[in-house]
Amino acid sequence: VDGVRRTWESTWSNPRDVLLLFDIDGTLLLKASREHAEALHAALRRIHLLEEIPTGKIEAAGRTDDAIARSILTLAGVPAERVDDRARDVRAMACAEYQHRCPADLRAHLAPGVPEVLDVLAARPDVDLALLTGNLDCIARLKVDRAGIGHHFPRGEGAFGSDSEDRTDLPEIARTRHGTARGEPPYPRERTVVIGDTPRDIACARADGCHVIAIATGPFRPSDLAGADVVVDMAREIPAALARIPGLA
């Protein structure tokens, strides 16, 4: 089956192009998650009538919003069936809460070099950009729009935490949407590069057979990101990193 799928994907009309899938928090934006966390916690309190949010043992880096919510609710003693039944309500409430809480201007939270490197990459005819993030889609779009970089990421493309609780599902979703938007099959995984700052970004790329560039601007050290094709320190190094991945040059 996988061989058939790879052959189908290889029929893309421009097989030398590259699809870059960008994470947001810790990659494009730094320290821009406080209001996001507050919105999710407020939604969990309101939907599940929680008095307190037990967050002390929850690791959020690289996880989807649904996965973070499930961990919090499990610690709070909410039955799994109820977590599933009210997940859609939590998403909707979190989006509404974030609309009220999101700062009007997030440009000060852009990681160094991000606006410039996105301009450079977007100007290349062989490169397409999209988002791949654990954020709910409504939250992700508001973040990049208010950071002044939303125009680089086409609406209706990419993949988000609202698409699947499991981050490893997201690259295939993003590749499929990219192809569908152009009347093509799913974009070839061997021409797709996930760009993120956590081991979970690396794991989701590898699960789908994609390349991955890790950027050490988040909470993890370069040694923690050694499973990537290339590890860089700054966003401005991404174009050079692409040239170092075999088969993409």
What kind of feature is each model-predicted range?
Residues S71, A76-Q99:
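Active-site phosphate-binding/coordination module
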Residues A37-H41, D65-D66, R70, R91-C95, ...:
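An amphipathic alpha-helix signature
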Residues G3-A61, A67-T74:
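Active-site neighborhood of HAD-like aspartate-dependent phosphohydrolases
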